[in-house]
């Protein structure tokens, strides 16, 4: 199976759970203690790590790095600072999948009872950050109807 790093994994459902069912080895990272407790209860096969993704240094590389519905809750500078962290956890050929908004901007949304912050840089800024940190932009699908309206990026680490 593949080695998967799920950043901002929350409860592990549905993403980490899906990879585990496939037979992949998943490391789930979340900064919230309550989410790590829930992750361990719901998907015990996941290697659960309580950590702030913005300061992550696991000393390992992964085939797939995910920051799905997590990365876009960070501010602009924190998002920029994530690209060296993505690269540090990638090997040649690793895939990076992350969600942003469709264009530059900030918004507030609701998750359950909580208000949550969303922030996105312009697509060209993400393309520049990917290239600068050794990733090849494979595609960007803004507000993709096949992905529940999420704006999703896929990139491959070339190390170049």
Residue ranges and their predicted role:
Residues 80-92:
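A short glycine-rich, Lys/Arg-flanked "PGG" loop and its adjoining helix->strand segment in the class I
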Residues 93-100:
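Conserved beta-strand signature within the Rossmann-like core of class I S-adenosyl-L-methionine
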Residues 101-117:
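Short, glycine-/aromatic-enriched active-site segment of Class I SAM-dependent methyltransferases
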Residues 118-133:
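Short alpha-helix
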Residues 142-160:
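Core SAM-dependent methyltransferase catalytic element
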